[in-house]
UniProtKB/Swiss-Prot annotation:
It comes from Staphylococcus aureus (strain JH9). This is NH(3)-dependent NAD(+) synthetase. Coiled coil: none annotated. Pathway: Cofactor biosynthesis; NAD(+) biosynthesis; NAD(+) from deamido-NAD(+) (ammonia route): step 1/1. The keyword Magnesium applies. GO terms for molecular function: ATP binding; glutaminase activity; metal ion binding; NAD+ synthase (glutamine-hydrolyzing) activity; NAD+ synthase activity. One of its GO terms (cellular component) is cytoplasm. Belongs to the NAD synthetase family. One of its GO terms (biological process) is NAD biosynthetic process. It holds the Pfam family NAD_synthase. InterPro entries: NAD/GMP_synthase, NAD_synthase, NH(3)-dep_NAD(+)_synth, Rossmann-like_a/b/a_fold. Keywords: ATP-binding, Ligase, Magnesium, Metal-binding, NAD, Nucleotide-binding.
Length: 273
């Protein structure tokens, strides 16, 4: 293991192997402890995409909220559907929601807001690329979740995990923004392991991961965008050997996207070297 890989493995907190029952108990306890430590929290808000990560986090949150209510703490889980117009995998979103069984479902179509933002920028002389418009979608989705959380005395729960965090494969202040990120410390295959243990339909954790943000490249697989497989990323995070090319791609992503893992730099926190 290289020196940098050792540093990254320590930072990303991924275990070489997990016990599903113990991990789920630990994740639920984190969520419950956070709510219990903040008496103002009356709801937890999460956008549901139909993918592996939001399905897992959604199930964990609902399980945690159920237990909190049994313990006398009034709390609600609000699952949010955030389509841009007509969502291509809407059936999978609904399948995920049936598995999660959230207390409440809110649907907000982000297309009008995103399109108006893009048009307003265009009128000001700023023409966004399709990729940049994809980031607008991610930020609008998170803005909506924070608006709901504000209205319902809640917090926003994130889906960031270590295989995503190491590569910076999320939009800054978009899907990378949240109050808590319960599944940080898991890699991609461990997330699949937990969903299988929880009895999720295979389609929800065996589907090809995609951010699906770009109009010109619908359903673009994450692995194509990253230039490396999740299998390699997971192996790297577990301290296992990967090919030199895989190591180079992973570490370049990690270094290039360091700013995404930090709050705004100050003159005291900017790592100049």
């Amino acid at each position: 293991m290289s020196k940098l890989q050792d540093v990254i493995v320590q930072e990303m907190k991924v275990k070489k192997r997990i016990d599903s029952a113990e991990e789920i108990m630990e994740l639920k306890q984190f969520i419950k402890n956070y709510v219990q430590s903040h008496s103002f929290i009356k709801s937890l808000v999460l956008g549901i995409s139909g993918g592996q990560d939001s399905t897992l986090v959604g199930k964990l949150v609902q399980m945690s909220v159920n237990e909190l209510r049994e313990e006398g703490i009034d709390c609600t889980f609000i699952a949010v559907k955030l389509p841009y117009g007509v969502q291509k995998d809407a059936d999978e979103v609904d399948q995920a929601l049936r598995f999660i069984e959230p207390d409440e479902i809110v649907t907000v179509n982000i297309k009008p807001a995103v399109d108006q933002s893009v048009q307003s920028l265009k009128e000001a002389g700023i023409v966004l690329t399709d990729f940049q418009k994809g980031n607008e979608k991610a930020r609008e989705r998170m803005k909506v979740q924070f608006s709901i959380a504000s209205n319902r005395q809640g917090i926003v729960v994130g889906t960031d995990h270590s295989a995503e965090n190491i590569t910076g494969f999320y939009t800054k202040y978009g899907d990378g923004a949240a109050d808590i990120a319960p599944i940080f410390g898991l890699n991609k295959r461990q997330g699949r392991q937990l969903l299988a243990y929880l009895g999720a339909p295979k389609e929800l954790y065996e589907k090809t991961p995609t951010a699906d943000l770009e109009d010109d490249k619908p359903q673009l697989p994450d692995e194509d965008a990253l230039g490396v497989t999740y299998e390699a990323i997971d192996n790297y995070l577990e301290g296992k050997p990967v090919t030199p090319e895989e190591q180079k791609v992973i570490e370049n992503h990690y270094i290039r996207n360091a700013h995404k893992r930090e709050l705004a730099y100050t003159r005291y926190t900017w790592p100049k070297s």
